[in-house]
């Protein structure tokens, strides 16, 4: 490996370490604040087709917007975004199956998660705008493809597909190892594997384990396999799915992700190319953990 290449790898790892450290160490505090803010608020539940109970929060007035979170996230992680959108929309933030207050039903399939979203959309009146981040963007894309006019508009941020050299083989190896750890109920090790896969150094993982967020992450660890299933067997952009999307779509990535996560830009570019009529936007100054204060005005303009 030449010196320039080594320097680039170190730089990208350092950048990603900072991003992950700030994002995940702040997660515990954000959840605690959200729980305090929501104390006494009635929790809503909708029943999916297979009997799974999906917990959700509902706030605001206006057209329905459903927020779909990514890996190791619950509805509390989107609480700030929901509050910012609530003056203009009725915002539904939900716990994906197996997370938070939602139940789970075996066997898992991505189709079941689409049915969960459909139940929520039906509860919201039969159609909704949908925003998804990371693996939640992948799920939102699948739902928009499958549910047709029920998804009025679709906004996705950094769906984690990658067609970089060697990405498919690395993905299959990661999935096999993760499935083995989860089968052995080694949840902490499964989370550690996941964080290592996305580039977090050992010291960042150690800080996360000591953070208030860790216990909740362990509880959600089995759903990492669900995220993997949604992203797909080889992590490639799902062209056949994307071409079936009827909703007006906004595809986003953050300008600050280009260094630590260089696959995000070509992935977003390709998605915008294959989704019919899709709009494309690079969110300046933002990385994978996009700021709700930056994102909310973009979604407000697009969904209106």
Regions found by a protein language model. Give the residues of each.
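Alpha/beta-hydrolase fold catalytic core
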Residues: 2-65, 88, 304
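Conserved HGGG/HGGXW glycine-rich cap/lid loop of the alpha/beta-hydrolase fold
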Residues: 48-103
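Active-site loop/oxyanion-hole signature of alpha/beta-hydrolase fold enzymes
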Residues: 92-131
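Conserved hydrolase catalytic core segment
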Residues: 127-165
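Hydrophobic, aromatic-rich cap/lid helix
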Residues: 212-237
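Short beta-strand/loop motif that positions the catalytic acidic residue
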Residues: 245, 251-253
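Conserved alpha/beta-hydrolase "acid-adjacent" motif
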Residues: 258-267
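Catalytic active-site module of serine/aspartate enzymes centered on a nucleophile-bearing elbow/loop
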Residues: 276-304
